[in-house]
Curated annotation (Swiss-Prot):
Amino-acid positions noted as binding ATP in the UniProt annotation, renumbered to this chain: 8-18
Organism the protein comes from: Escherichia coli (strain K12)
EC numbers for this chain: 6.3.4.20
Name of the featured protein: 7-cyano-7-deazaguanine synthase
Superkingdom to which the source organism belongs: Bacteria
Cofactor(s) this protein requires: Zn(2+)
Binding residues for Zn(2+): 188, 197, 200, 203
Keywords: ATP-binding, Ligase, Metal-binding, Nucleotide-binding, Queuosine biosynthesis, Zinc
Pathway(s) annotated for this protein in UniProt: Purine metabolism; 7-cyano-7-deazaguanine biosynthesis
GO biological process, one term: queuosine biosynthetic process
Amino acid sequence: MKRAVVVFSGGQDSTTCLVQALQQYDEVHCVTFDYGQRHRAEIDVARELALKLGARAHKVLDVTLLNELAVSSLTRDSIPVPDYEPEADGIPNTFVPGRNILFLTLAAIYAYQVKAEAVITGVCETDFSGYPDCRDEFVKALNHAVSLGMAKDIRFETPLMWIDKAETWALADYYGKLDLVRNETLTCYNGFKGDGCGHCAACNLRANGLNHYLADKPTVMAAMKQKTGLR
């Protein structure tokens, strides 16, 4: 039996990964992390979606220690989430240092427990938000270290790594879940479901991708299929 663990926030990217994983694996587990995030409404959204989509199990792990160590606008109410700035340089204040290091490591431990061969994460390098822990180089390096440390070949899969947001919408549509992802996921840094607040970087990236996809579905769908190998 093929098993996978999805790092699941209830947002657009991880929900799209879950939708695909449910088609590719016999048994899919979800793991969600409570780190005292500003947008912790995503935890309830993740619970609802994991149940609705048919995950075998959904575990919510308390990692609030991360909140004490990592200073970010997503972990401190005193630091405002900035509006989207197209020319912004450097690492944004929404970056939570160590978050994906911790999430992927704990997800791998959980995968070891449930005998899953893969950990799936929705990180993306094509139009990422300036986060160093979304890079392919980082994921591969951590995957190697974790596999060595556990003496087990647990594979980190990144199905969105080389597709952009428009193509991520196309992937959801390919599996017949465009409306679900559009209306029932929570991507917004300010914690608003669906289209979100419309001002933060996460909402802007999501909206621009959707508009691009809806404006030229055939072209974007074809590009997504070419990059992912889907037919």
